[in-house]
UniProtKB/Swiss-Prot annotation:
The protein, known as: Early glycoprotein GP48
Organism of this sequence: Human cytomegalovirus (strain AD169) (HHV-5)
Glycosylation sites: 48, 53, 61, 69, 108, 112, 122, 139, 148
Location of this chain's protein in the cell: Virion membrane
Keywords in alphabetical order: Early protein, Glycoprotein, Membrane, Signal, Virion
Domain of life: Viruses
Residue intervals passing through the bilayer: none
Main localization, broad class: virion
Signal peptide interval: 1-25
Entry PTM: N-glycosylated and possibly O-glycosylated.
Family as reported in the entry's similarity comment: Belongs to the RL11 family.
Membrane topology annotation: Peripheral membrane protein
Length: 152
């Protein structure tokens, strides 16, 4: 009986691995650390910030989760320039109007955004690097979270 329970616990993981292998040929899942928001009194990225580690495969997708459920989340990537809003000011994708999905392309970076997650699409090795998300609360305090992406 105990052996049967252990087998049933592993079944979802085995099925997921088989599905990924059959559909994609490879399967890369994973964050190794959870993202944490870091308070920044001086509006700069904190020097002691810890990044959540994510990995992806070329031509695959990766989803950064754990973003604050606010429309003022911003993406600041060290690979490019400046601050860009990821969930505002861009044309809405055709489709389900109940979900706030947006898409924007710049410097080979394509993504879909909702209010609490960001999915990078069609990954290339150029997308590897650190991604910082900045949020400002009602008291004008800045918070940052960091994601370190490795694409191989």
């Amino acid at each position: 009986m105990v052996m049967m329970l252990r087998t049933w616990r592993l079944l979802p993981m085995v099925l997921l691995a088989a599905y990924c292998y059959c559909v994609f040929g490879t399967c890369s899942i994973g964050t190794t650390t959870a993202p944490v928001e870091w308070k920044s009194p001086d509006r700069q990225i904190p020097k002691n910030i810890t990044c959540a580690n994510y990995s992806g495969t070329i031509n695959g997708n990766v989803t950064f989760r754990g973003l604050q459920n606010k429309t003022e989340d911003f993406l600041h990537w060290l690979l490019g320039w400046g601050h860009k809003s990821i969930c505002s000011f861009f044309p809405k994708l055709q489709g389900n109007y109940n979900e706030q999905h947006y898409r924007y392309e710049v410097a080979n970076l394509t993504y879909n955004c909702t209010y609490n997650r960001l999915t990078l699409l069609n990954l290339t090795t150029e997308n590897s690097g650190k991604y910082y998300f900045k949020r400002e609360d009602a008291n004008f305090t800045f918070y940052y979270s960091c994601y370190n992406l490795t694409v191989s």
